[in-house]
Amino acid sequence: MELGPEPPHRRRLLFTCSPTPAPQPTGKVQFGASRAGGLSPVTNLTVTMDQLEGLGSDYEKPMDVRNSSSLQRMGSSESTDSGFCLDSPGPLDSKENLEISLRRINCLPQKLLGCSPALKRSHSDSLDHDIFQLIDQDENKENEAFEFKKPIRPASRGCLNAHVHEESKDPFTHRQNSAPARMLSSNESDISESGNFSPLFTPQSPVKASLSDEDDGFIDLLDGENLKNDEETPSCMSSLWTAPLVMRRPTNLADRCGLFDSPSPCSSTSSCSTRAVKRADRSHEESPRGTKRRKSSEASPVKADVPEPTQLPHQSLSLTSFPKGTIENIFHSDPRDLIGDFSKGYLFHTVSGKHQDLKYISPEIMASVLNGKFANLIKEFVIIDCRYPYEYEGGHIKGAVNLHMEEEVEEFLLKKPIVPADGKRVIVVFHCEFSSERGPRMCRYVRERDRLGNEYPKLHYPELYVLKGGYKEFFLKCQSHCEPPSYRPMHHEDFKEDLKKFRTKSRTWAGEKSKREMYSRLKKL
């Protein structure tokens, strides 16, 4: 048989179609080098093994069978049943084999599960002829660029059951993408025809195979997933898109109770605490249908609306020691209007001043206290005059105590603190000439030392005030409460030396104070 020139990219091993030579002794065939000629070691070994007895060689067959089989297939191709295409096609191939939609060439053997390619030669020989004819027709396709097949969403398993049964009958016509061409056992067709088809070895393909499809050679990652058809969208979901927006009720800050407010006034008026905390009622359109919650509500009998309990007040560990009436007063008050120990609100009406962290009172409030207006609520009313002694002697508020040094104030107030009794308060008011520097600084110092000497939030003097405008403004408005009824400024020409002396003393004491604080911090380390 005369063959044309083979293309350079295809490597094939060709043998001359000559009559089979006479058999030689086994020892010479096995070890002789003259037989090998110019063949490669692998080819020599293949020819030698085929000529051995007991391995299905040609010598076991009659002479006429050997002559006819040598024209169709050489012995060297018997070990190539896996599809490596080392032989040329035979002349007896029929045209009907072209219609076979074989899509994989370099693939696994057909009988991989349960058998060996060497033991199934009769069936593989017929397949090799089909493979060789397809190679000759489509040998230029190997030069084309290989592209992986794009994954396609698999259809439902139930929709392809009938199609899978048809495909399983003929494994070569419509083979699955993810399975090789020779992956199934010999009884595959019997199983599929009997109806006991199992998808274990034949995964379902998302799309029916065709002759033009290119097999990717990889396992389809989308196979084996139990995907169901999209269920019909419930009507409650459509209401989320079509229903109007539901606005939550805005919370009014004016009606909301404070941090320490009690629920009694809120519940008596319009139950503001319940309105601020209670969830908004869900509409019937928002609630999904067919849920477990709906099931339980239908099974249980309908009950009358039970009024929701009022909001429990926030409890604080610092308020456990106070009586019930005091705690109620705390809840009624705004947290910003509570005194230092958070036990009650401020007694006096405060005004804005230079320092936002301090509470200021007007000269009129000071005069009303001196007139005894709050005598039933106040046990002790202490006025600390923070001016220098020459200023205090020039005129001061009746009953005021002149303490211009921090150590003097600490010894007067904190060494022997004044204890309130009978529910009455102890109030301390600080002032200087303008109540801009010395008075506010002294007020902060007393609060700081009081905090250090007590467990938070307890204080000896929880209610501290600063007189707005100082002694100068009070003298102009309430001169009758001044003693003597005069006013001496700090920068008086007759007391320049006294001013220098007191300032130096104050600065020295301030420097010593900073040193003492530094020493105390070092001791703590």
Curated annotation (Swiss-Prot):
GO biological process: cell division; G1/S transition of mitotic cell cycle; G2/M transition of mitotic cell cycle; positive regulation of cholangiocyte proliferation; positive regulation of G2/M transition of mitotic cell cycle; positive regulation of G2/MI transition of meiotic cell cycle; response to radiation
Motif (Phosphodegron) on chain: 74-84
Active site (record annotation): C432
EC number: 3.1.3.48
Biased composition, class Low complexity, residue ranges: 262-274
Pfam families assigned: M-inducer_phosp, Rhodanese
Reaction catalyzed: O-phospho-L-tyrosyl-[protein] + H2O = L-tyrosyl-[protein] + phosphate
Keywords on record: Cell cycle, Cell division, Hydrolase, Mitosis, Phosphoprotein, Protein phosphatase, Ubl conjugation
Region feature (Disordered): 1-42, 260-318
SUPFAM superfamilies: Rhodanese/Cell cycle control phosphatase
Biased composition range(s): Basic and acidic residues: 278-289
Residue ranges constituting the Rhodanese domain according to the UniProt record: 377-483
Record PTM Phosphoserine, positions in chain: S76, S79, S82, S88, S124, S178, S283, S296, S514, S520
Activation and inhibition: Stimulated by B-type cyclins. Stimulated by PIM1-mediated phosphorylation.
Subunit structure: Interacts with CCNB1/cyclin B1. Interacts with YWHAE/14-3-3 epsilon when phosphorylated. Interacts with CUL1 specifically when CUL1 is neddylated and active. Interacts with BTRC/BTRCP1 and FBXW11/BTRCP2. Interactions with CUL1, BTRC and FBXW11 are enhanced upon DNA damage. Interacts with CHEK2; mediates CDC25A phosphorylation and degradation in response to infrared-induced DNA damages. Interacts with HSP90AB1; prevents heat shock-mediated CDC25A degradation and contributes to cell cycle progression.
Protein name: M-phase inducer phosphatase 1
Origin species: Rattus norvegicus (Rat)
